[in-house]
Amino acid sequence: MVSVSEIRKAQRAEGPATILAIGTANPANCVEQSTYPDFYFKITNSEHKTELKEKFQRMCDKSMIKRRYMYLTEEILKENPSVCEYMAPSLDARQDMVVVEVPRLGKEAAVKAIKEWGQPKSKITHLIVCTTSGVDMPGADYQLTKLLGLRPYVKRYMMYQQGCFAGGTVLRLAKDLAENNKGARVLVVCSEVTAVTFRGPSDTHLDSLVGQALFGDGAAALIVGSDPVPEIEKPIFEMVWTAQTIAPDSEGAIDGHLREAGLTFHLLKDVPGIVSKNIDKALVEAFQPLGISDYNSIFWIAHPGGPAILDQVEQKLALKPEKMRATREVLSEYGNMSSACVLFILDEMRKKSTQDGLKTTGEGLEWGVLFGFGPGLTIETVVLRSVAI
């Protein structure tokens, strides 16, 4: 008779979870950051708020963002005036948009990832979907299963309302699934659409304006699995270790509330300070077992909550400016796409490493870190190992 431990052993993969493909997608509508304040104050009928507009222009200018992609076009906003007001009841209109757009954009990214992976989609065993937008039942995971034509017995996981740290969470979950289920191939999809958070400006709620200056729409998809099939599957990064922690004394630093007026965000001024204060401890926990204490010797993928967070982390750890190159590039070209951001940065890094003729997918280095920061204040840490190009 076979023992439970033998069954358990047979169920587990041999090697570490590996990212085998990455795909990304954005809505067609691209907005230039330099002219966005004009558009934003016009469409929200707020042009009379001249001081507030000047403040918003300064926020946009300092954001280090060149452009963002948004599902919400001028036409859509004109058809939905309640979405343009500051706190008008508008949840129905917002939900009707995002329950369609989140799976649609997610499908676009997933199709690209599946194509790069090169295996039939029938080999996908698990699906993880993450979004901060829209909550219907059955959820976006079900809609994606249908849109992609996945098998009905794919094991699905739906993560709603996590926020900006969740790009790390989906990797942590995918790693556990891939390593504990021999032959598992996990499709991960983060799809974020800001239609749920867009609203007009308010003199009394400036942290809402910060979100209006930073957030963009995007979806990213990965295929994750252990023990890649030689000659068919091409590993991009290995996931070696993961952790999640709530930063001490950080309650209320980042809050989101889904109400009749949509999703509102509240940020404390010291979010960059809280992140930079706690990052050293997270790095020691992650890299001490590997004998690494020089954080300029690893590659960096950090959720770009905003330029101030990146600046303070760089300063605190005395990082060379080029360490955050991929992170700042994604922030500049897409804005803050919540959970999808770090997956876009993974894609940017492996592509640039190949273009530049470097030895590994991680800018020529072996070890790297991926950080997610978000409501809680929650910090996700993933230790990555690059792959030779």
Swiss-Prot record:
Pfam families assigned to the protein according to its UniProt record, in alphabetical order: Chal_sti_synt_C, Chal_sti_synt_N
Disulphide bonds in the chain: none
SUPFAM superfamilies linked to this entry: Thiolase-like (SSF53901)
Catalytic reactions of this protein: (E)-4-coumaroyl-CoA + 3 malonyl-CoA + 3 H(+) = 2',4,4',6'-tetrahydroxychalcone + 3 CO2 + 4 CoA
Keyword Transferase listed: yes
Keywords attached to this entry: Acyltransferase, Flavonoid biosynthesis, Transferase
Keyword Protein transport: no
EC number(s) reported in the record: 2.3.1.74
Molecular function GO terms recorded: naringenin-chalcone synthase activity
Pathway note: Secondary metabolite biosynthesis; flavonoid biosynthesis
Similarity comment text for this entry: Belongs to the thiolase-like superfamily. Chalcone/stilbene synthases family.
Protein name: Chalcone synthase 4
Organism name: Medicago sativa (Alfalfa)
Gene name for this UniProt entry: CHS4
